[in-house]
Structure formats: structure tokens, C-alpha cells
Regions:
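Cys-nucleophile CN-hydrolase/nitrilase-fold catalytic domain and related Cys-dependent amidase chemistry
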Residues: 19, 24-108, 112, 176-206, ...
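Ligand-binding pocket scaffold of soluble enzyme catalytic domains
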Residues: 8, 112, 138-141, 162, ...
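Active-site-proximal beta-strand/loop segments in catalytic clefts of secreted hydrolases
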Residues: 12, 45, 88-90, 149-150, ...
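CN hydrolase (nitrilase-like) catalytic-core segments centered on the catalytic cysteine
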Residues: 66-86, 153-261, 367-389, 454-551
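N-terminal glycine-/serine-/threonine-rich phosphate-binding loop
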Residues: 1-40, 301-339
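Active-site catalytic loop in hydrolytic enzyme cores
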Residues: 76, 94-195, 199, 253-259, ...
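Short beta-strand scaffold segments in enzyme catalytic cores
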Residues: 87-89, 101-105, 136, 232-234, ...
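C-terminal beta-strand edge segments of enzyme domains
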Residues: 203, 207, 212-306, 437, ...
Length: 611
């Protein structure tokens, strides 16, 4: 394992219409970082050209081949200082005349390889072709490096697939504009992707060096100006952010000199608990992730619903069923006192019994599918006139399951879900074999439980199955995930310091309102909340405290608003299902092994065909 090494995230600001000058300036900053001892240096997206051109024709003279003039100049620095550089380049392919938004990796012996951006935003599609490199991983002395570019982070796959392929470290290449809340409705077209890139590390156990621009770019031929967000950051593979630059001040000018963030990456952390969860994936459940369900999906909700969503938290004490019922009922009474509205109320995991400590205790508290827990939840649903979700230990044909139940306002059971990605402590439980989504009068509802949230494939399937709302009873004690480390100043609404990063990520990458209910006491860290589809500039999430019983509610309209930068329909349309196939393959299959073990991104295992 290599020793900790110095890294640099460079907030470099290229100039429009100045390709040669941009190479000189980018090389000067790269030389400075390399001379300071940085072994990995990351520069922003389109770093040699600038970005907001009028059209492809105006952009073309400032594009470069990869490898090309830019990588050749950087290679001299890498050779001189024994370092690696990841840089964003607007690429022209001379063989085809196709143009790509590309990340290039250069090392001590020269050009190593490229990644062509897959997650194209509404500007990218004006002049770039979707990437055709997959998500390659490059083996270096610093670890296995992958590149992710800006809007890619709208999706969970761009980090997950490299992680499954063995990546250790992300070079995140970005030109992310910041939210201008004073613009009102116009701000809703703004995505500010660098604002919350934590999911890329937190879900996959990868280190990351993330670079953005931090200035204003103005195109005098269009009058368009964009303020880039700054907020370069450095992340360890165990999920900690160990370096961070501030968000840009919106009054900065074109002449802002940029900045360099230095820090260290510790390769000893490449082996970590979250990366170990890759061995617990359930590819046999993920088949629909390879389905492209756009532009039309007849399973998707045809209309939106104005509803109230609520998360309930209270002390759930093992062995105190009557007390748990009483504490849950106290919260139900507070909700009954409020004006009635359609909606859904989510209770913590093991709603009435508490979590069993061992198999004997699990067997003792197990119930039938319509046992006491479901009966009490049915009573709550009728009294609240809302859908209700809770969970219990279910006994069925001699097996035990951790089961979530969705109960309708009339008290009938709409559906149930057996936890598919079991917490390691649940040795008594059998795993479920489906990730269902249920049609209801308030839209389509998906269910997850506890450590399911550590697996983006699980919420990914619910998104592909077009869940409008995801309800998650949990018993979270802080052993995984952790607090969301946002970039202050890039959100229209701030986040509570105890916002759980994975719950936020589920909502963001599934584009489904996500309602999580956790217990308090006995090590549980509360923080129940409603996590919104568009937290950057439209809706603030609501999060409960760590210790206190209570409820948190939010009035929402399912499916979001048509003028938002993203919704589930757009998310599904933007997915690269052709590249996502490996998440669905059995890990002992020939196609998976060929993809995992072959350099680059070998898709021949599922694309090769001869008549």
C-alpha cells in the first residue's frame, strides 16, 4: 500500500476564445502544484477552452484532440515531477469529427487514457456526443483512478461501476455553476452539481479530489454569464471531507485568479467498511436497471398528487411492546389534531417490538403477516386517514424476515416488502427477493429498510419502477453513512447538521421524495426526515433532531414541477442503461469477469453479436 500522498484540486479559470493562452496558464498552475509535491492534480471541466459558447461552430476552434496539444504540454510537467494530472478537455475526434466532453489522465510516462462524459446536461447536448468509453479505471502507483465529470453526479452509476471494477480514487472534473437564488424561477434551471458530491464517496468507499472553477464566464456574442461555484474538495475513502474551499462570491469577476486546494489522500483507507458492502450486492434483483424506459413508461404515474408526508420518531425499546405502542400512539395523537390531508406517515423499523438482539429473540417476537404490528398500523391508518408504513419481524413457513408493511387509509394492507440487503446483525433473517413498488391513490410508493440505503442499486430499481415516494423505516445508529457535508452557499436552503448523507442521496438519485423514520435512544440517532427531489434551489428538506421524539412533515406535490432542472422522467431519460449492465450481472459470470478484469471498459460480454 503506498504511503499518504499530496494532492491538489485546482480552481483554474480558462478564458473563452483563448485556447493557446489557456494551455499556458493551466500548465503554470499545474507546474506550481507539482513543484509543491502534489502527486495527483485535478483541473476543471473544459479547462483549455472555457464552456459557454454560442454553438458547436463557435466552440470548435478551441477544442483539442485527446491525446493532443494539451496533454502533450501537461505530460512534460508530469515527467519532470513524477505526478499525475486529470484535466477536462473539450475534445474533437479527428477520425469522426465527433466532439466529446472528455477527461484526460496524464502521468509520469505520458498520456494514460480518457473518459468521455456520459451524464450530459442541457448545455452539453448542444455540442457534445454522449460518451463511448464507459467508465474506465486506470491502474497507477497511487491506486486505481477513475474520472467523473460534473453532471455525471446526477446519477449513481458513474461512481458505482468504477467501484465494482476496483477503483480506489475519483478525479472529479467539474465546471459547476452556482445557484443564483435572486433570479427566482430562473434558478430552477441550475443544478450546481459540486454542491453535494459526497454520495460518490459515501456509497462506494472511494477517495476523491474534486475541482471546479470559481469565476464568472461571459460570452459577449450571446450576453450569457455564468458564475461557477468553486468549492473544490478532498475526500478520504472512508467518507470524510478533509479539505474544502469556499463557494464563490457572486460578485467575483472574470479576472478572479482561481485557487489551489492542497491535501493528502491516505491509501490505507482504500480498504473500508463501505467498500466491503460491494460483496453484499444482489445483482439478481437489479435486472431492470438495464431497461431503458423512456420517453414513455406506462407504469409511471400519469398525474401528480398534493400530499403531506410525515416521518415519526420515538424511542423504540426492545422487549417493551406495550410501551412502544404507547409512544407511537402519542405521536399519532399529535397528527390527528392537525387538519386532515392525503398523505403517508412512516414509523421507525421494528415499530412496536424493537430490534431483536439474537435469533432466539427474533423467533420470540415474530408475527404472521397480519399480526399485532400490522393490526396496530391499520388502526393508525384509519385514524389518520393516511397511508402508514412500519416494520416487524415476520414469520412465514419457518423462515423469519424483516418486513415493511404499507397500509391504506381504510386499514387494508396495500403491500409488503421484505428487506433485501440485510444488516449484518440480522443473522436471524432471510433476505427478500423483490424490490416492489405499489400503485396507490397518492402515487406509486416504494419501500426500503435499514441498510438497503447503502446500496444505490436498491433505490435505483425503485426509480426505474417509477416510485414517486420512497418510505424507509430504519434503525440507524451512525455506523454507516454520516452527516451530509454540503458546500455552504451553493444551496438555496441549508441543511441541518445531522442530515444523513445516504438518505439525501437516495432522494437525489432516484428523484423520488424519500421519507425516513428512525428511532431515538439506545444508540439510535434520530434525524428522521423528508428528503426532497430538488433541494438545490426549490425545496428544503425537513430533518428531526437526534434525541427528541416527534414528527416532521412536508407538503409536497409528487413528481415535482415541470420547470425544475431535474425530475424522475428526465432522470430515466438520461440514464446510460447500455453502460449499467455490469450491475445486473452475476459476479461469477463470464461477461462480468471479462468486464471487471479487462483494462478500460470492455462491453463485449454483452454487446458482441454476429449474425
Amino acid at each position: 500500500m503506498p504511503a499518504p500522498f499530496k494532492v491538489a484540486a485546482v480552481e483554474f479559470n480558462p478564458e473563452l476564445f483563448e485556447f493557446e493562452r489557456n494551455i499556458e496558464r493551466a500548465c503554470a498552475l499545474t507546474e506550481e502544484a507539482a513543484a509543491s509535491g502534489a502527486r495527483l492534480i485535478v483541473l476543471p471541466e473544459a479547462a483549455l477552452s472555457g464552456y459557454i459558447y454560442r454553438d458547436r461552430a463557435q466552440f470548435l476552434p478551441y477544442m483539442d484532440t485527446v491525446p493532443g496539444k494539451g496533454t502533450e504540454a501537461i505530460a512534460e510537467i508530469c515527467a519532470r515531477h513524477n505526478c499525475y494530472v486529470a484535466i477536462g478537455i473539450a475534445e474533437i475526434d479527428p477520425a469522426t469529427d465527433l466532439t466529446y466532453n472528455t477527461g484526460a489522465l496524464v502521468g509520469p510516462v505520458g498520456y494514460i487514457g480518457k473518459y468521455r462524459k456520459n451524464g450530459l446536461n442541457s448545455s452539453d447536448i448542444m455540442w457534445f456526443t454522449p460518451g463511448n468509453t464507459g467508465y474506465p479505471v486506470f491502474d497507477t502507483e497511487l491506486g486505481k483512478i477513475c474520472m467523473i465529470i460534473c453532471y455525471d453526479d446526477t446519477y449513481w452509476e458513474p461512481a458505482r461501476l468504477p467501484a465494482i471494477k476496483g477503483a480506489d480514487l475519483i478525479a472529479y472534473i467539474c465546471s459547476s455553476d452556482r445557484v443564483l437564488t435572486q433570479l427566482g424561477a430562473e434558478a430552477k434551471g441550475n443544478h450546481s452539481t459540486i454542491a453535494a458530491v459526497q454520495q460518490l464517496c459515501a456509497w462506494n468507499g472511494l477517495a476523491m479530489v474534486a475541482a471546479d472553477r470559481n469565476n464568472v464566464e461571459t460570452n459577449p456574442t450571446t450576453g450569457l454569464s455564468v458564475i461557477y461555484g468553486g468549492s473544490a474538495s478532498i475526500w478520504q475513502a472512508d467518507g470524510r471531507r478533509t479539505g474544502h474551499l469556499p463557494a464563490t462570491d457572486q460578485n467575483l469577476t472574470l479576472n478572479n485568479p482561481g485557487a489551489v486546494l492542497y491535501g493528502e489522500i491516505d491509501p490505507a483507507l482504500y480498504v473500508n467498511d463501505q467498500k466491503a458492502t460491494l460483496q453484499r450486492r444482489r445483482p439478481e434483483l437489479y435486472g431492470e436497471l438495464a431497461f431503458y424506459r423512456a420517453p414513455t413508461d406506462t407504469k409511471a404515474s400519469a398525474q401528480s398528487h398534493a400530499i403531506t408526508v410525515t416521518a415519526v420518531q420515538y424511542a423504540v425499546v426492545a422487549g417493551d411492546t406495550d410501551g412502544n405502542i404507547g409512544r407511537a400512539n402519542e405521536q399519532v395523537l399529535t397528527l390527528q389534531d392537525r387538519a386532515g390531508a392525503d398523505g403517508i406517515v412512516v414509523f421507525p423499523a421494528f415499530t412496536l417490538t424493537g430490534a431483536p438482539a439474537d435469533p432466539d429473540e427474533a423467533a420470540a417476537i415474530a408475527e404472521s403477516g397480519l399480526g399485532r404490528t400490522v393490526q396496530v398500523l391499520s388502526d393508525f391508518a384509519v385514524r389518520l386517514h393516511r397511508f402508514v408504513v412500519g416494520s416487524h419481524v415476520e414469520r412465514d413457513n419457518g423462515a423469519l424476515f424483516h418486513t415493511a408493511v404499507l397500509v391504506a387509509p381504510d386499514g387494508t394492507v396495500t403491500g409488503s416488502y421484505r428487506q433485501t440487503h440485510l444488516d449484518p446483525a440480522y443473522s436471524w433473517a432471510s433476505a427478500g427477493d423483490d424490490l416492489p413498488v405499489f400503485d396507490t391513490s397518492i402515487g406509486r410508493v416504494g419501500l426500503l429498510l435499514c441498510e438497503d440505503v447503502r446500496f444505490p442499486e436498491a433505490s435505483g430499481v425503485l426509480a426505474v419502477r417509477r416510485a414517486d415516494v420512497i418510505a424507509i423505516p430504519t434503525r440507524w445508529d451512525g455506523r454507516y453513512g454520516g452527516a451530509l457535508q454540503e458546500s455552504k452557499g451553493l444551496f438555496a436552503h441549508g441543511f441541518a447538521p445531522n442530515t444523513m448523507c445516504l438518505w439525501y442521496a437516495v432522494a437525489k438519485t432516484s428523484q423520488a421524495y424519500t421519507v425516513v423514520a428512525n428511532a431515538v435512544g439506545d444508540g439510535c440517532q434520530g434525524s428522521s426526515g423528508v428528503f426532497t427531489m430538488n433541494p438545490v434551489d426549490a425545496e428544503a428538506p425537513v430533518v428531526a433532531g437526534i434525541d427528541d421524539a416527534g414528527t416532521v412533515s412536508l407538503d409536497i406535490t409528487t413528481r415535482g414541477q415541470p420547470d425544475w432542472w431535474m425530475d424522475q422522467r428526465r432522470l430515466i431519460a438520461g440514464r446510460r442503461t447500455d453502460l449499467a449492465v455490469p450491475v445486473t450481472l452475476g459476479t461469477d459470470s463470464a461477461a462480468f469477469l471479462r468486464w471487471r478484469d479487462t483494462p478500460g471498459y470492455d462491453m463485449s460480454g454483452w454487446t458482441a453479436y454476429s449474425q
